[in-house]
């Protein structure tokens, strides 16, 4: 099992991060959340997705919108204002989905978090605001997970480079790196330092940190939730 290690505060490395996030962008990231943003976040969810510990999915929010919309706004606004995820909002069920028929070990299962609907709304709004600046802070050679870019562009580029090398008789070497569970192995403290170096406002970084720090998880075993830990 992977265990996080303390990171070194490598100032020289962090100084290489360009400060590309300006005040105008930060003002957009920090602007007060509106009911329209909350409704857009809910409308962009799949209505019949399995609920989290609260038992509510997007369909419930849509049906009861006129009754609960103001309470939702208070909850989300307080989270933004305090930079915290309050109450049980960061509680989640953990379901293991088999990757194939021969799923007989933990590495053959994909963990899926079933989160509180309030948590989903907060992170949807945050992601919606964040995606508009990804193009400005992500290098052009990063082809995946950025709207408007295609991951296969880099594949074609590598194929062309290899073809050219073979055609011209040039000597060279190709190294392929595939990091197992790369997403889970990224150091969160390091990411927060990088965000600050990019120029993200400390308030926004704290809000992001609150969303992924100190979660409470209850594994689902044979359809029943084990104790939270």
Give the positions of each predicted feature.
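Surface-exposed loop/turn segments and immediately adjacent short secondary-structure elements
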Residues: 1-107, 113, 121, 225
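Residues that mediate protein self-association or partner binding, especially
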Residues: 1-5, 42, 50, 97, ...
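Conserved pre-motif C helix in the palm subdomain of viral-like polymerases
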Residues: 2, 107-138, 156
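Conserved catalytic palm subdomain of right-hand nucleotidyl-transferase polymerases, strongest
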Residues: 49-56, 88, 104-114, 153-196
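Short glycine-rich loop/turn motifs
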Residues: 91-94, 111, 171, 214-216
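Conserved polymerase palm-domain catalytic core
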Residues: 179-229
């Amino acid at each position: 099992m992977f265990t996080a290690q303390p990171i070194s505060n490598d100032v020289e490395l962090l100084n290489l991060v360009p400060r590309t996030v300006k005040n105008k962008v930060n003002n957009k990231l920090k602007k007060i959340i509106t009911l329209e943003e909350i409704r857009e976040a809910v409308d962009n969810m799949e209505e019949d997705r399995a609920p989290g510990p609260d038992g509510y999915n997007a369909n419930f929010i849509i049906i009861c919108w006129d009754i609960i919309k103001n309470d939702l706004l208070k909850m989300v606004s307080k989270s933004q204002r305090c930079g915290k995820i309050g109450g049980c909002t960061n509680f989640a069920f953990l379901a293991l989905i088999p990757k194939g028929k021969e799923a007989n070990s933990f590495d053959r299962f994909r963990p899926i978090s079933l989160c509180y609907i309030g948590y989903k709304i907060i992170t949807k709004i945050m992601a919606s605001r964040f995606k508009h600046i990804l193009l400005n802070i992500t290098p052009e050679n990063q082809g995946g997970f950025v709207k408007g870019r295609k991951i296969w562009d880099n594949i074609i580029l590598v194929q062309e480079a290899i073809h050219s090398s073979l055609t011209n008789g040039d000597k060279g070497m190709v190294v392929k790196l595939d990091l197992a569970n790369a997403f889970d192995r990224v150091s969160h403290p390091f990411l927060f330092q990088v965000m600050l170096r990019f120029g993200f406002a400390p308030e926004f970084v704290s809000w992001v940190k609150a969303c992924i720090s100190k979660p409470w998880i209850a594994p689902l075993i044979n359809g029943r939730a084990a104790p939270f830990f």
